[in-house]
């Protein structure tokens, strides 16, 4: 038995650290990261099925323009007035050189998403898309469209419990907005 313990303790596997590596040089697992402002906006448009994939052509539209359903990379960025959505999610200042982008996480970002007309419009579109299905299947479809996965049994049970209240029975847009604002949507593991 002592020989077995000695062999295990002296092995390279036993001596490896279990702490997170900042450089992650061996790429054993991806570090968790938040979507950038552009990626977040585009992901919401894709989830709601509204992203325009055709050649944009013509004049660029502001990010805040409700008719702008193109990718954010094609949007007009004003150096004087940076869009509030982009500003909340660490879009770099267009007036100065930025070698890299900072990443901050603040409560204001969640509040902005929960009160954003852009996010509410995407959520309403998602809610309207699956009107013909029952509750359980509708929840399943929303999870698949927004989070690209099925809900876990506990998530499904919690979601069904949410809709048992008759006042919330028709609040599918609110439910879709909660999924769009969730960490599972905002972050990639």
Feature roles, as predicted:
Residues 157-167:
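Amphipathic alpha-helical segments that form the core helices of the histone-fold
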């Amino acid at each position: 038995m002592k020989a077995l313990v000695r062999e295990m303790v002296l092995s390279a596997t036993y001596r490896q650290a279990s702490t997170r590596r900042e450089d992650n040089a061996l790429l054993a697992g991806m570090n968790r990261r938040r979507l950038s402002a552009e990626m977040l906006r585009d992901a919401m448009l894709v989830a709601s099925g509204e992203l325009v994939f055709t050649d944009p052509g013509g004049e660029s539209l502001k990010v805040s323009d409700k008719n702008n359903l193109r990718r954010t990379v094609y949007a007009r960025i004003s150096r004087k007035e940076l869009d509030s959505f982009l500003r909340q999610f660490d879009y770099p200042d267009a007036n100065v050189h930025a070698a890299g982008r900072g990443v901050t996480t603040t409560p204001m970002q969640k509040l902005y998403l929960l009160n954003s007309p852009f996010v509410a419009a995407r959520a309403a579109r998602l809610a309207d898309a699956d009107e013909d299905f029952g509750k359980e299947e509708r929840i399943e479809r929303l999870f698949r469209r927004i989070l690209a996965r099925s809900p876990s049994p506990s998530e499904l049970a919690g979601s069904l419990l949410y809709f048992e209240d008759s006042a919330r029975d028709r609040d599918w847009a609110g439910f879709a907005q909660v999924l769009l604002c969730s960490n599972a949507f905002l972050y990639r593991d």
